[in-house]
């Protein structure tokens, strides 16, 4: 197991991608801090981690609150002593055309997706630098690269999170601390279902696909540097733009 003896803090870990990441990292030997607002969900995930033979604590947190984020960090340090991995996975998406974006929806999206990433990173970054090891993975979105219609607040938050990830990585280089941005495409989650009417959910990425990807990144040798990486759903690939007809599928 490549993460034996390490501790990972995962936000948004009560369900979906965060839960899948928690279980995947536990299978590689990591102890897990399961963090999210939903107490019942994170307690259930913590039990799943323990069933895999790893230690886990469930910590309720609203990543918009500096005090709650610091309390999460304090709980992690008290239980495990050190934290080597942080996965910033909390996120929200309220999709509307620009004239219909409310100030409350804008603030919620920016506060969770961008401010939350900042606060959680800040809570662990100095600790990692002092220990001369650490890896921060920010699960962002492919919307960090393309601002599509009705994704104004969402894209703005994700573009910002990508830039912040790059800064985190640059500041961590001298201390052996890495930061990686993971940009998933369409994933079959509750958040996706709330905003999209997908006729075929089997065509979407599954949370486990993203979790496997994050685990791959976190288990590379120290010499490997992955600053940013995308993973997409096959059905969203753009159609070929050339006009050459292919015969017999070749």
Give the location of each predicted region:
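Substrate-binding pocket helix/loop in short-chain dehydrogenase/reductase
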Residues: 97-98, 105-110
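Conserved glycine-rich cofactor-binding loop
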Residues: 7, 14-16
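The beta1-alpha1 cofactor-binding region of Rossmann-like NAD(H)/NADP(H)-dependent oxidoreductases
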Residues: 39-40, 60-72, 103
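Residue(s) in the substrate-gating loop at a strand-loop-helix junction
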Residues: 141
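C-terminal helical subdomain
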Residues: 174-177, 181-182, 189, 197-239
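Active-site helix of classical SDR
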Residues: 121, 157
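Conserved glycine-rich Rossmann-like NAD(P)H-binding loop of the short-chain dehydrogenase/reductase
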Residues: 28-44
């Amino acid at each position: 197991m490549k993460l034996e003896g390490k501790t990972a803090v995962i936000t948004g870990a009560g369900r979906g991608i965060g839960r899948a990441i928690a279980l995947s990292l536990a299978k590689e030997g990591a102890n897990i801090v399961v963090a999210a607002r939903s107490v019942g969900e994170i307690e259930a995930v913590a039990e799943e981690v323990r069933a895999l033979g790893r230690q886990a604590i469930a910590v309720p947190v609203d990543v918009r609150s500096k005090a709650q984020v610091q309390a999460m960090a304090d709980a992690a340090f008290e239980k495990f002593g050190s934290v080597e991995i942080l996965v910033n996975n909390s996120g929200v998406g309220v999709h509307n055309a620009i004239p219909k974006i409310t100030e409350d929806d804008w603030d919620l999206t920016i506060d969770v997706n961008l401010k939350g990433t900042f606060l959680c990173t800040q809570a662990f970054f100095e600790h990692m630098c002092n220990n001369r090891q650490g890896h921060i993975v920010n699960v962002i979105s492919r919307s960090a690269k393309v601002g599509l219609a009705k994704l104004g607040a969402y894209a703005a938050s994700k573009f910002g999170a990508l830039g912040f990830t790059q800064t985190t990585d640059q500041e961590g280089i001298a201390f052996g601390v890495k930061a990686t941005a993971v940009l998933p495409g369409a994933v079959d989650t509750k958040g996706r279902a709330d905003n999209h009417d997908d006729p075929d959910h089997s065509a979407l990425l599954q949370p486990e696909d993203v979790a496997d990807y994050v685990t791959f990144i976190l288990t590379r040798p120290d010499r490997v540097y992955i600053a940013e990486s995308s993973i997409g759903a096959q059905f969203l690939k753009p159609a070929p733009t050339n006009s050459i007809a292919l015969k017999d599928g070749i």
